Amino acid sequence: MEEKRGAFKIVEVDRVEKLKELLEQDPADSFVQHALALEYVKSGDDPSAQKLFEDILQREPSYVGSYYHLAKLFERNGNIQEAIKWYEKGMKEAKKAGENHTYNELRSAYEELTF
């Protein structure tokens, strides 16, 4: 069993390295940044994930998928007010973009914190 876990760790590291290489080619690629941020979340590197999510949303506020993950990161770390702020921003952007599914996910998470 230990051998399998080690193999999974190698795959995760390889994935992170591949995503970093792709970002070197196009540092403003929000899709790749988002994917790398999710890998950081999985590995417990919340500061790196937070920076990437915030970079994406500063540059491209309409990249609505990142709001949920950034807010969840803050929520998980006990920063509820910051999580609420990001859920609210995300709901506003999702509504503006007509992203109803994303809006509903954000609203549901927001309501869990505020009601």
What are these regions (language model features)?
Residues Q25, R59, R76, E93-A97:
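Structural marker of alpha-solenoid helical repeat scaffolds
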